[in-house]
Amino acid sequence: MTSINDTRARAVADLAERLVLASVDVAAAPERVFHALASKEITEWWVRPGVFDTREWTGDVRRGGRWRASGMTRGEPYVQEGEFLEVDSPKRLVHTWERAGNPGVVSTVTYLLEPVDGRTRVTLRHLGFASRDMCGAFAIGWETSLERLAEILAPEFLLDHR
């Protein structure tokens, strides 16, 4: 059995398929995790220190709704955006991902949330990178971000279960 504070995420990049698979077990209910994945709370966990920092997020969380995130990456501003393809709270969230101003380069992010031993296992699948290098970099970024998500939600879980 893992500790409540064990927030290690794992990510692997399949460079040939241009696919990232990542997972983390979060000490929180699926409903709470889903909210963190689909709200402005993204600005708290969607970070990789020294590489990127998400500062703003907006979204219309419904099938066909749009989302937009902005921040800084290596000292330069960035904007990511996409469309929600599936919204099945608190089990599954699927959206497209593209850098604003870079039409035609669209990838897809799928989050699956499963209750496991009083926690929520988040499994992420990000498919459709423009290059192998980008795929490899995103594997590191997703691992860092999912670890941060688990770290942020663990203290809430401990408070709720005293």
Task: Write out the residue ranges for each language-model feature.
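K/E-rich alpha-helical interaction surfaces of small helical-bundle regulatory domains
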Residues: 32-35, 39-44, 139-152
